[in-house]
Swiss-Prot record:
One of its GO terms (molecular function) is structural constituent of ribosome. The gene is rpsG. This is Small ribosomal subunit protein uS7. Gene3D superfamilies: Ribosomal protein S7 domain (1.10.455.10). One of its GO terms (cellular component) is small ribosomal subunit. HAMAP family: Ribosomal_uS7_B. It comes from the Bacteria. Keywords: Ribonucleoprotein, Ribosomal protein, RNA-binding, rRNA-binding, tRNA-binding. The keyword Ribonucleoprotein applies. Part of the 30S ribosomal subunit. Contacts proteins S9 and S11. One of the primary rRNA binding proteins, it binds directly to 16S rRNA where it nucleates assembly of the head domain of the 30S subunit. Is located at the subunit interface close to the decoding center, probably blocks exit of the E-site tRNA. Belongs to the universal ribosomal protein uS7 family. One of its GO terms (biological process) is translation. It holds the Pfam family Ribosomal_S7.
């Protein structure tokens, strides 16, 4: 891996329906094997299901879910004197939303409902209400960071 400079961040166009870059990145994370139309159909159908079943604004529910699942701390492995330490570090905005979308998608795919549309709709609704597997993943990450607070002086970057 080259160490000269970091790769440039690609410009991601906002989605057509809600004009949101965050939602567009979420759709890209759902996408498998380049099937973006199918990923969009899954997300927008899940939004329709949220709107019909719970009678709430689906886009606002999505934003609340992403905000609730987004971690503030995580642990990174740092090697010091032949030992690896789990050092708590702050998570920047972009990585936080990336982790949140990954956790929501993984939690949704492991649910017991039959179709991904139903799984995603329920997981987003639960995450927006601070419940569900994705929220538990965030809490576990924060607990791990809190437990390793003693190693924060090994931090590779300033907190």
């Amino acid at each position: 891996m080259s160490r000269r400079h970091a790769a440039e961040k690609r410009v991601i166009l906002p989605d057509m329906k809600y004009n949101s870059i965050l939602l567009s990145r979420f759709i890209n994370n759902i996408m498998k094997e380049g099937k973006k139309a199918l990923a969009e159909k899954i997300v927008y159908s899940a939004f329709n299901k949220i709107e019909k079943k719970h009678r709430v604004d689906p886009y606002q529910t999505f934003n609340n879910a992403m905000h609730n699942v987004k971690p503030h701390l995580e642990v990174t492995s740092v090697r010091v004197g032949g030992a690896n330490y789990q050092v708590p570090t702050h998570v920047d905005e972009r990585r936080g939303y990336t982790l949140a979308s990954r956790w929501i998608i993984n939690a949704a795919s492991k649910r017991s409902e039959k179709m991904m549309i139903d799984k995603l709709a329920e997981e987003l609704f639960e995450a927006s209400n601070n419940r569900g597997v994705a929220i538990k993943k965030k809490e576990d990450t924060h607990k791990m960071a809190e437990a390793n607070k003693a190693f924060s002086h090994f931090s590779p970057k300033k907190m």
